[in-house]
A protein has these predicted regions:
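Conserved redox-cofactor binding core of oxidoreductases
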Residues: 1-94, 98, 106-107, 177-180, ...
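FAD-dependent oxidoreductase catalytic-site/capping-region signature
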Residues: 2-46, 55-56, 211-436, 440-442, ...
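Marks the mature luminal ectodomains of secretory-pathway proteins
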Residues: 66-67, 84-88, 95-102, 121, ...
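Structural detector for helix-capping/boundary residues
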Residues: 72, 90, 125-126, 400, ...
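Loop/turn elements at helix/coil->beta-strand transitions in domains of secreted/extracellular proteins
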Residues: 81-85, 124-126, 421-423
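Short loop/edge segments at beta-strand edges and connector loops
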Residues: 88-90, 160-162, 404
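Glycine-rich loop(s) and the adjacent beta-strand/alpha-helix scaffold that form part
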Residues: 94-230, 234-240, 321
């Protein structure tokens, strides 16, 4: 495993570590990729585009606890600030703007509901929206900012006609293949046994050790390996057909041109593979509790693939003018035919990973396969299987993108919502394109940069 503290960084508030122990799958994963001609060259944090790596986690190595945003930034000194009040269990209903028709709209207050009681709090300077990719656009639309015709259809009076709000939704859809492990091999599925679960919890509560204190995942960023030149050219032609469609929004036209170039770059991955040492059951869904419920008898690992640069796009919009109503979410995953083919080809290659000597010796000979009873090798079958099994990776992004307004953008380079003077967005909804991997670090980086921008603008005012 190649990783240096200097590359990861050690001075920030968010803690990152690899846990205190490893499973047999960690080393086998690296050896498997090496045997397939893809050794680890360097830590991806340094910019390595392709190859396997052991996945770090946002785990504090001293306490073995999650280093989440509140733990990292909401320290005791911060919570004592007199200009900070945190209210939980409240639902923001809308942003109220002044009634002037001249110039950009200015937010004057926030209306919210808590325990059935409605409240209004004044906004003397700015309103910062950090409600996430699905609810930031919902709040803008509830406040009259969005596609004017859509707002009117729900009885909302348009204030700023901004068609990009809620559009451009992107996500990394994952397809999971499950393999039964050899007798004696560890698996998270063993936690079904109350005694095993109790022992794991006891070890963790004692000193942070045991399986609950580890970072169990290993990953790889990879190009599409078994992809003959003529087939690759056909895939590019599929994208070109999209670009030739006169109805394609200018937003997607520019994005597809960029993504097409990435597909041709041998140093740029088209998918990420992840090994998770437990079973995933997409057919048991749609609830996450059922998908991760480990209800299938036996002990398994899952290998998943997710497209690094999907072309498929979805949307999220209000379902009514009622703030309590959930928005309508269209994930759009695997909507573009090029995504379907790429996902299928990467899924087929997951079977090849398990056939390497390093991985095969950890799996039960003739063991159960959760995704399909037989090896998946044909493209058409793989495409159908991907459509059946695909799940969200919960990396939703892009619904209030930082792009030019004429290209479907919602926020400017200073994070301000077009048509407003004092409303900013600080979350993953402002990504024009979803990053190729997990979005957590990028969200933290955006928030850090946003803090700098806000302070700079306040200093000028």
């Amino acid at each position: 495993m190649k990783s240096e503290k200097e590359d990861q960084g050690v001075s920030g508030p968010v803690q990152v570590s690899f846990g205190d122990q490893y499973m047999p799958y960690h080393g086998a994963w690296l050896r498997a990729f090496d045997s397939l001609g893809w050794p680890q060259t360097e830590d991806p944090i340094k910019g390595a585009g392709v190859g396997p790596f052991v996945t770090p986690g946002a785990i504090d190595p001293a306490t073995r606890t999650r280093s989440h945003a509140a733990a990292a930034y909401l320290t005791a000194d911060v919570t004592k600030r007199t200009n900070l009040r945190i209210m939980t269990g409240a639902r923001v209903d809308k942003i109220a703007f002044d009634g002037s028709d001249a110039g950009p709209a200015t937010a004057r207050s926030i209306k919210f509901t808590k325990d059935g009681q409605k409240y209004t709090v004044s906004a003397s300077r700015e309103v910062i929206l950090a409600a996430g990719t699905t609810q930031t656009p919902q709040l803008l639309e509830l406040s009259g900012i969005g596609n004017a015709s859509l707002l009117r259809s729900h009885g909302i009076q348009p204030l700023v006609d901004l068609a990009g709000v809620g559009e451009n939704l992107q996500d990394h859809g994952i397809v999971s293949f499950g393999y039964e492990v050899a007798d004696g091999m560890p698996s998270g599925d063993m936690a079904r046994d109350p005694a095993v679960a109790a022992a794991a919890m006891s070890a963790y509560q004692k000193d942070g050790s045991g399986p609950l204190g580890m970072v169990p995942l290993v990953s790889a960023f990879m190009p599409c390996v078994d992809f003959p030149g003529d087939k690759r050219e056909h895939l590019l032609q599929t994208i070109d057909s999209s670009l030739d469609d006169p109805k394609l929004p200018v937003t997607y036209r520019k994005q597809y041109s960029i993504l097409r170039g990435m597909l041709k770059d041998s140093n740029e991955p088209t998918a990420q593979y992840i090994l998770a040492p437990f079973q995933l059951l997409p057919r048991a869904g749609p609830n996450a509790k059922d998908i991760f419920g480990m209800s299938h008898p036996g002990n398994f690992i899952s290998i998943v693939s997710l497209l690094s640069h999907p072309l498929s796009r979805g949307s999220v919009h209000v379902s009514s003018a009622d703030p309590a109503a959930a928005p309508t979410i269209d994930s759009g995953i695997l909507r573009h035919p090029a995504d379907v083919e790429l996902q299928a080809r990467h899924s087929i290659w997951m079977e090849k990973i398990t056939e390497t000597e390093a991985m095969a010796q950890l799996l039960k000979p003739g063991g159960q396969r959760l995704h399909a009873p037989d090896k998946v090798a044909e493209l058409e079958k793989a495409q159908d299987l991907c459509k059946e099994l695909v799940l969200s990776m919960y990396h939703v992004s892009g619904t209030c993108a930082m792009m030019p307004r004429e290209d479907g953008g919602v926020v400017d380079p200073r994070l301000k919502v077009y048509g407003t003077s004092n409303v900013r967005v600080v979350d993953a909804s402002l990504f024009p394109l979803v990053p190729r991997g997990n979005i957590q670090a990028t969200v933290f980086a955006v928030a850090e940069k946003a803090a700098d921008i806000i302070k700079e603008d306040l200093a000028r005012s």
